[in-house]
Amino acid sequence: MPRPPTTTVDPALDAAALLRRIGFFGLFVVLPVAAQVSRRATVVLAPIAVVLLITASAIDQHQRAVWPAVRRLLTAPSFLAGMLVVFWSALSLVWTPFPGPASERLANLIATVVMTLLAYLALPDRMRSANLYLLPLGVAAAAIVAILINLVGDAMLKDNPDGDSALERGAVLLALLAWPAVAWLRSRRRDIGSLVVVVLVAGALLLAPGVTALFALAVGALAFALTHWRLSLGVRVTAIAAAGLLVVAPLLPFLARPIGVALFGPVAPGVLALKAWQKVVTLEPVRLVTGHGLETALRGRIFGILPINAPTTMLFELWYELGVVGAFAAAFALYGAIHRAGRDATVLAPCAMAAFATAFAIGCVGVGLVTIWWLTTLSMAILTFVAIERGQFRSRRPKVGLIPRLPARG
């Protein structure tokens, strides 16, 4: 009598799978929804989810080999350029007029980078589709919650003093996470589902308090359309536009202010901000080399070092705080990262370019340089795209007619 097959159950592997599922559920579902009602949700929940993912990988060892992955990172020019930005930020503590707040800001930056690297190394070599389908589910649920809050916001947020701020940050998170959600659904040929996600996110951003997220989503849509039409052109345009704006940022107020005066008048807030930027560049051209040091752009407005109406964009703050070294290193890192994303994942490339364009537009419009919630949001987007790329291993199932017949036994 044949012996019935026996299966070995490993409780440790089951526990690791459960921890990983909970981690991705928190990262892809709980966090986007909670970010619509709490401005601190991203900073609090993201590290918890990352710890769960790291614990799961430590148990089942399903991640890629650590040292080869670290070696690839350390030999990647764009990664080294990014580390140069971090190093220059640390070195700027020597000449910043606010060493205490700048040290805290640098610690937040380093902690976010370390968290992202640990989560990257902890991601499994092959992602399960069940975990990745949580992403569009969470983005759609968060968009629905945002729509409901914006429609009946007075009743739901009357006891929440940070309601509008949470909605603005939640809208930024939705604009950025919409693209990896669409990328996953398109890679699974769920085009209708991806269209539903885009419509829900666009509806939520239309009702959101600010226009930053909606504008950034529109910029991302243009990058998506261009890359979908012609892959190499879309990647090249996105990389050159982002890196080029970082490089020539000090010239922008001199070019944009006459146009702004002609369109909106000389006393428009945006025109006055450009005038303040012009004055900073003209009065201290030598400081464009080293920058004024970390945290100077924010604290400088409070203590009168900068005009109160100075721009709050990434382009201004990067040059003002880190100078030409930080700006050129950041531009090189961004250019290399965009090209690498377009080369390594052609299926995901249109949505990856859209995410790069969306994030860059958000930074240019007014998020700033290294705000902790913004850095954590960028970290989430990076990890999400890496996870989706590792979920593309499935081959197409062969048709029944293509399976060779077994020879008949005589």
Question: Can you name each region flagged by the protein language model?
Answer:
Residues 20-37, 49-105, 141-149, 248, ...:
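N-terminal hydrophobic segments of proteins, predominantly signal-anchor/transmembrane helices
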Residues 264-322:
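Long extracytoplasmic/lumenal interhelical loops at the membrane interface
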Residues 10-16, 59-79, 184-196, 229-238, ...:
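Membrane-interface helix-loop-helix junctions at transmembrane boundaries of multi-pass membrane enzymes
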Residues 322-360:
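Hydrophobic transmembrane alpha-helices and their immediate junctions
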Residues 127-157, 164-229, 332, 336, ...:
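Alpha-helical transmembrane segments of multi-pass inner-membrane proteins
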Residues 48-56, 353-362, 368-410:
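Transmembrane alpha-helices of multi-pass inner-membrane enzymes
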Residues 77-85, 99-122, 133-141, 172:
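Aromatic-anchored transmembrane helix interface
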Residues 60, 87, 148, 207-208, ...:
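A membrane-periplasm/extracellular boundary helix in multi-pass inner-membrane enzymes
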